[in-house]
Curated annotation (Swiss-Prot):
Interacts transiently with the RNA polymerase catalytic core formed by RpoA, RpoB, RpoC and RpoZ (2 alpha, 1 beta, 1 beta' and 1 omega subunit) to form the RNA polymerase holoenzyme that can initiate transcription. Interacts with cognate anti-sigma factor RsrA under reducing but not oxiding conditions, which prevents it from binding to RNA polymerase. Treatment with the thiol-oxidzing agent diamide inhibits the interaction. It comes from the Bacteria. This is ECF RNA polymerase sigma factor SigR. Residues 148-198 are annotated as: Sigma-70 factor domain-4. InterPro entries: RNA_pol_sigma-70-like, RNA_pol_sigma-70_dom, RNA_pol_sigma70_actinobac, RNA_pol_sigma70_ECF_CS, RNA_pol_sigma70_r2, RNA_pol_sigma70_r4_t2, RNA_pol_sigma_r2, RNA_pol_sigma_r3/r4-like. Residues 1-33 are annotated as: Disordered. Residues 43-106 are annotated as: Sigma-70 factor domain-2. Belongs to the sigma-70 factor family. ECF subfamily.
Length: 227
C-alpha cells in the first residue's frame, strides 16, 4: 500500500485533520498505538456497516475497513485529540472507497448479511433535525428491514452515501461535506434528491402493506410541486 495522501487521511478539510495538538516527540509509538486502539477501534462496527452500505459486498467491506484503519493509524499523529474522530475516520473511509473500491467493486452478494441494525433504524427515525418526514419515519418503524435495505440500495451511490451519513450515522451537513469532500450545497442537494427517491420507494412498500393510504404520497407530491 502506498503512502497516505492528505486527501485519503482527511487533512484538507476541518480542524480535526490539522497536524496539531501534541508537541513534537511528546508521544511515543507505543502510546500512540494504545491511544489508537482505545479511541479508533470503538467505531469498528459502525465503519463496517458503512463500508457494507458503500460496497454492497462483505468481502470488499472488510478490505475497505482494513485499508481505512491502516491509513488512519499511519496518519493518527495528525489527528487532534478532542475533535471529531468519527468524522475523521469516515472521511478516510469515504475517500478510500471513492478512490479505490468504486473502480474495482465485485458484484454484490445479495444473500450475505447486508443488514441495517435495529439501533441504526431507530436513529434514522429519530434524526429529525435535517428534515425527515413522516413517510420515512413510519416506514422505518413498521417496514421489514429487507424493504428498507432494498430501497437504500436502489438509490444512486452519491445519494445513498449522503443519506446514510445523515440519517443513519447522524452527521450534520458540514460534517458530511468534510467527509465527502463536497460543498455543503452539494450535500443538501444530494440529501434532498436521495430522500425524495427513498421516500417514494418506502411509500410504495408501505402502501403495498396497507401502512399508508393509497394516493397519500401522490397528493403530498402534488402539493409540493404546486407551491
Amino acid at each position: 500500500m502506498g503512502p497516505v495522501t492528505g486527501t485519503d487521511a482527511g487533512t484538507e478539510h476541518g480542524q480535526a485533520e490539522q497536524p496539531e495538538g501534541r508537541g513534537t516527540g511528546a508521544e511515543s509509538t507505543a502510546e500512540r498505538s494504545a491511544r489508537f486502539e482505545r479511541d479508533a477501534l470503538e467505531f469498528l462496527d459502525q465503519m463496517y456497516s458503512a463500508a457494507l452500505r458503500m460496497t454492497r459486498n462483505p468481502a470488499d467491506a472488510e478490505d475497505l475497513v482494513q485499508e481505512t484503519y491502516a491509513k488512519a493509524y499511519a496518519s493518527f499523529h495528525q489527528f487532534r485529540e478532542g475533535t471529531n474522530l468519527k468524522a475523521w475516520l469516515y472521511r478516510i473511509l469515504t475517500n478510500t472507497f471513492i478512490n479505490s473500491y468504486r473502480k474495482k467493486q465485485r458484484e454484490p452478494q445479495r444473500s450475505a448479511a447486508e443488514e441495517i441494525e435495529d439501533w441504526q433504524l431507530a436513529r434514522a427515525e429519530s434524526h429529525m433535525s435535517t428534515g425527515l418526514r413522516s413517510a420515512e419515519s413510519q416506514a422505518l418503524d413498521h417496514l421489514p428491514d429487507s424493504d428498507v435495505k432494498q430501497a437504500l440500495q436502489a438509490i444512486p451511490e452519491e445519494f445513498r452515501i449522503a443519506v446514510y451519513l445523515a440519517d443513519v450515522e447522524g452527521f450534520a451537513y458540514k460534517e458530511i461535506a468534510d467527509i465527502m469532500g463536497t460543498p455543503i450545497g452539494t450535500v443538501m442537494s444530494r440529501l434532498h434528491r436521495g430522500r425524495r427517491q427513498l421516500r417514494g420507494m418506502l411509500e410504495d412498500y408501505a402502501r403495498d402493506r396497507g401502512l399508508v393510504p393509497a394516493g397519500a404520497g401522490e397528493s403530498n407530491e402534488a402539493k409540493g410541486s404546486g407551491s
